[in-house]
Amino acid sequence: MTPFMTEDFLLDTEFARRLYHEYAKDQPIFDYHCHLPPQQIAEDYRFKNLYDIWLKGDHYKWRAMRTNGVAERLCTGDASDREKFDAWAATVPHTIGNPLYHWTHLELRRPFGITGKLLSPSTADEIWNQCNELLAQDNFSARGIMQQMNVKMVGTTDDPIDSLEHHAEIAKDGSFTIKVLPSWRPDKAFNIEQATFNDYMAKLGEVSDTDIRRFADLQTALTKRLDHFAAHGCKVSDHALDVVMFAEANEAELDSILARRLAGETLSEHEVAQFKTAVLVFLGAEYARRGWVQQYHIGALRNNNLRQFKLLGPDVGFDSINDRPMAEELSKLLSKQNEENLLPKTILYCLNPRDNEVLGTMIGNFQGEGMPGKMQFGSGWWFNDQKDGMERQMTQLAQLGLLSRFVGMLTDSRSFLSYTRHEYFRRILCQMIGRWVEAGEAPADINLLGEMVKNICFNNARDYFAIELN
């Protein structure tokens, strides 16, 4: 029987153990997409307690707690921090088989150094007190944890109207060497069907000093904000494409669509598709000219529980996987961006694992001469960010493309403790390749495969995003 979560966790062949310990383990972290609050990094935030750093804002944990029958006041409500932690500790033993069980104990190991102890009601007091004592130390501040985890770069997620003042503050601090760069997330300027669109256009117009009436005005406003982001080191965009749409329109049609929406009219689905297509094609060209990477996160079905949405708002654990087709529209969109050779480097993520092969084959249609891995099939996202999901994504990428050119893992997280997801990914990667070697499906060449692992863990992302590190 194999003990739980030793130093060789998941490494079930000798070759996998060598790959991980000699090549993967000590690679730095290039976390190119996350949702960490830049203000906390700028202020070097000190966490009040284990709840503050670990459970606050974590919709993965809330979903599990709700499934375990925990009252909402202990998830998002007015219960005390300790009450919420105790509710989580009581839920953890029920999460065996869920990635939360592995994540929880990896996060207790690093950075807290807690090994050989499982979180449960019987250990909750000891773990709460031990972690809180450590969180009071300087090296467990926001920056301290990032430095402990050997992070070299993080890309936060930022709205076009953001001032980016916290990124500027971080960049001016010569004592902190980790790159913290903004990522452009223009969903609110894109989702014309949303009730908040008109208010957002007013805010965008104000910060860009542009009166947005026609589509060209919107382009002007977005260009000014792109310049603002570029001045703060941005090299990455991110789009939530819950549904991929494609429909072309001329300038007069786009002007009419925008004007009628600003006047309060409801648009048809075709008109929404026309507007979204035009925005994505315009932005894609801007990204290409600037050498940016665009990311498309495709296929979320959001805010399913209307009663809870009205009570709690979005992003609190009531989203799931959509099953709408996307291949044809995505193909047309990428082809349109490519017509003028202005398709930027692109990472495609799908939430429905049914679509893995769709994306795995789609990227092969639009690769770029002289640019290894220009089009990427992104790592297992959200509900696929678990052992089977990551194995499926990497196996299918290997079968349909080049795994060796993969830009690897990202946390996509709001928590400073989530860097162990890179460790989890690396262990799974080494396990998978080790099994290939054991079965005679890959050569037992430690130098060849070791370099491949190092590249997937760090080097490929560093080179792909072309961000100069400190």
Swiss-Prot record:
InterPro entries xrefs: Metal_Hydrolase, Uronate_isomerase
Biological process annotations from GO: D-galacturonate catabolic process; D-glucuronate catabolic process
EC number: 5.3.1.12
Recorded GO MF terms: glucuronate isomerase activity
Gene3D superfamilies found in the cross-reference section: Metal-dependent hydrolases, uronate isomerase, domain 2, chain A
Catalytic reaction annotation: D-glucuronate = D-fructuronate; aldehydo-D-galacturonate = keto-D-tagaturonate
SUPFAM superfamilies in UniProt: Metallo-dependent hydrolases
Assigned keywords, A-Z: Isomerase
Source species, domain of life: Bacteria
Pathway: Carbohydrate metabolism; pentose and glucuronate interconversion
PANTHER family, A to Z: URONATE ISOMERASE
NCBIfam families xrefs: PRK02925.1
Protein family: Belongs to the metallo-dependent hydrolases superfamily. Uronate isomerase family.
Full protein name: Uronate isomerase
Organism expressing this protein natively: Escherichia fergusonii (strain ATCC 35469 / DSM 13698 / CCUG 18766 / IAM 14443 / JCM 21226 / LMG 7866 / NBRC 102419 / NCTC 12128 / CDC 0568-73)
